[in-house]
Swiss-Prot record:
The keyword Iron does not apply. This is Sensor protein kinase WalK. It comes from Staphylococcus saprophyticus subsp. saprophyticus (strain ATCC 15305 / DSM 20229 / NCIMB 8711 / NCTC 7292 / S-41). The gene is walK. GO terms for molecular function: ATP binding; phosphorelay response regulator activity; phosphorelay sensor kinase activity; protein kinase activator activity. InterPro entries: HAMP_dom, HATPase_C_sf, His_kinase_dom, HisK_dim/P_dom, HisK_dim/P_sf, Light-responsive_reg, PAS, PAS-assoc_C. It catalyses: ATP + protein L-histidine = ADP + protein N-phospho-L-histidine. The chain crosses the membrane at residues 14-34, 184-204. One of its GO terms (cellular component) is plasma membrane. It comes from the Bacteria. Its main location: membrane. The lineage of its organism: Bacteria, Bacillati, Bacillota, Bacilli, Bacillales.
Length: 610
């Protein structure tokens, strides 16, 4: 169907219109020319025949005016014989007033002389004395042909009609001549049309070429290519249109570049936003979602694109789009229960100037940490209040007992005062621990580091506890080579005191505390392991023992004088030394506390070099 497409092109249509206009024009001109030429030729032909008839009439009048009636017929015959060789004249007859054929120019019809002519046109000419003519078809042996019959009455000087000059003239030559002229005209028209078609293609091309270029450029623009330009062929309207089209293409290219730039910028902003973004169409179907939203919800993009936003956020049973549009409040949602992520969701509506809603946007702000901090703050306040209330209540009870007269009892009074002092010391330890944690949270706790021989440092701490705890066996596995580390001795002493004290407190039976120190020279790290044979910690609670005020067995810990802050302080101190502390425990088999710290093995002479 390629030819059909070419036939329907503007170029071909212009050529066809151009050719049709030429054909119509040539037809009109040809029709007018043919009609005019036909009239002119036939009129000329008839005028010539009329002149012949007039000459014959004049001569016949002379013959009859001379009163030579005896020789009149012979002279008329001689006169007609003179016109016998005229090409356009087929036959000339002279009929007298009695309609008797007196003479004829045609040899083959002389047998009709002295016979009566019954032609109506002859009767009309003789009876009315008027000229008449008409065209008939006659066959002279060569087929039927047009014959113009002309009747001219012959009158004497006294207006008496003496006869009729009857002429049959072959007018077919005139029409043959017209036919030849028409053929020449048709051939000329055909040649003109051929030239017109050829010129039309070139002329139409001057119009359609810029339009074709603009069409091709439009196709390229639809594909996103705005670099091509339409060639300007002149300063006419087509040229102005091409110039305007080039300007339009340039502006569209600039606008597209700006749009793409803004889109990339917007995509980059949405992608790297710390908040999750979900954008929908006007029906609430998810069309855009950024990586943060996918991470928060723990899902894949292809799993939610096209789904309803309320279904994705698990709100379809509680709200509708209309309610969200009317309600500007935010919501707290457990956006990912598996990960424990809580998000604050804010909704906004995309509205056109006409008020038509085109979509919705949901902004997911991760408030998990905030909620956890708030929860920990409430728990912290509750724990501090509880830890202070217990000794204060106990002290208040003993003071009331002393006020009631127990101070007079020599046996009870010292016991009450001893308990009051212990509770006071416990509150002082609690407040001191809280102050230390507060300083570390505010990074106002000063850490004074110095390079120490860790072997000597840890052995000194173990020796001290070993001397005071006669019922506990201490097992050491410390490398013989010297290990140096940069620490704050006082702060790290506090850490190991807390860990060792807990190990001794919770050991049972034949109490045993093991110390293992291993060095990783490749990473310049060392690991200290303190293991007891105590009651152990449930596996689901191991990670929580470093939380503030957390106790596995609250009653037992409080009975042993613990504040629940020792390991929390130890964790802060270890992390301040770029270290790490964690626990590993099997319930009923004991607990191991692991501490990693930076270290360095110094060769002999390194101290002197410094």
């Amino acid at each position: 169907m390629k030819w059909l497409k070419h036939f329907q092109s503007l170029h071909t249509k212009l050529v066809i219109v151009y050719v049709l206009l030429i054909i119509i024009g040539m037809q009109i001109i040809g029709l007018y020319f043919t009609n005019s030429l036909e009239k002119e030729l036939t009129q000329t032909f008839k005028n010539n025949i009329s002149q012949y008839a007039k000459q014959i009439e004049i001569n016949i009048e002379k013959v009859y005016d001379e009163d030579n009636a005896i020789n009149a017929q012979k002279e008329v015959q001689n006169l007609l014989n003179e016109y016998a060789n005229r090409q356009e004249i087929e036959e000339i007859r002279f009929i007298d007033k009695d309609q008797i054929i007196m003479a004829t120019s045609k040899q083959s019809t002389r047998s009709l002389i002295n016979q009566k002519a019954n032609d109506n046109s002859i009767q009309k000419a003789l009876s009315l004395g008027e000229i008449n003519s008409h065209t008939v078809l006659k066959d002279y042996g060569n087929g039927k042909q047009r014959v113009w019959v002309y009747n001219l009455p012959v009158k004497t000087s006294n207006d008496g009609t003496i006869g009729d000059v009857y002429i049959e003239a072959d007018i077919n030559d005139v029409y043959n001549q017209l036919s030849n002229i028409n053929q020449i005209f048709i051939v000329g028209t055909g040649i003109s049309l051929l030239i017109t078609v050829i010129l039309g293609f070139f002329i139409a091309r001057t119009i359609t070429k810029p339009i074709t270029d603009m069409r091709n450029q439009t196709v390229e623009m639809s594909k996103g290519n705005y670099t091509q330009r339409v060639k300007i062929y002149g300063n006419d309207e087509i040229g102005e249109l091409a110039l305007a089209f080039n300007n339009l293409s340039k502006r569209v290219q600039e606008a597209q570049a700006n749009t793409e730039s803004e889109k990339r910028r917007l995509d980059s902003v949405i992608t790297h936003m710390s908040d999750g973004i979900i954008a929908t169409d006007r029906r609430g179907r998810v069309r855009i979602v950024n990586d943060m939203a996918l991470t928060m919800m723990g899902t894949m993009k292809e799993d939610i694109i096209g789904d309803h936003m309320l279904k994705v956020l698990k709100l379809e049973e509680d709200f509708s789009l209309d309610e969200i549009q009317e309600n500007n409040d935010s919501f707290l949602l457990d956006i990912n229960e598996n990960e424990g992520i809580i998000a604050r969701v804010n909704f906004s509506t995309i509205v056109q100037e006409t008020g038509f809603v085109t979509g919705y946007i949901a902004v997911l702000h991760d408030v998990t940490e905030q909620q956890q901090v708030e929860r920990e703050r409430r728990e912290f306040v509750a724990n501090v209040s509880h830890e202070l209330r217990t000794p204060l209540t106990s002290m208040n009870s003993y003071i009331e007992a002393l006020e009631s007269g127990a101070w007079k009892d020599g046996e009870l009074a010292p016991q009450f005062l001893s308990v009051t002092r212990e509770e006071t010391e416990r509150m002082i330890r609690l407040v001191n621990d809280l102050l230390q944690l507060s300083k570390m949270d505010n990074e106002s706790e000063q850490i004074t580091k110095e390079i120490v021989d860790f072997n000597m440092f840890i052995n000194k701490i173990i020796n001290r506890h070993e001397m005071s705890a006669k019922d506990t066996t201490f097992v050491r596995e410390v490398p013989t080579e010297t290990i140096f580390t940069e620490i704050d001795p006082d702060k790290m002493t506090q850490v190991f005191d807390n860990v060792i004290t807990n190990a001794m407190k919770y050991s049972r039976g034949d109490k045993r505390v093991e110390f293992h120190v291993k060095q990783n020279a490749l990473y310049n790290r060392m690991t200290i392991r303190v293991k007891d044979n105590g009651i152990g910690i449930p596996i689901n609670k191991v990670d929580k023992i470093f939380d503030r005020f957390y106790r596995v067995d609250k009653a037992r810990t409080r009975k042993m004088g613990g504040t629940g802050l020792g390991l929390a302080i130890s964790k802060e101190i270890v992390e301040a030394h770029n270290g790490r502390i964690w626990a590993n425990s099997v319930e009923g088999q004991g607990t191991s506390i692991f501490i990693t710290l930076p270290c360095e093995v110094l060769e002999d002479g390194d101290w002197d070099a410094e």
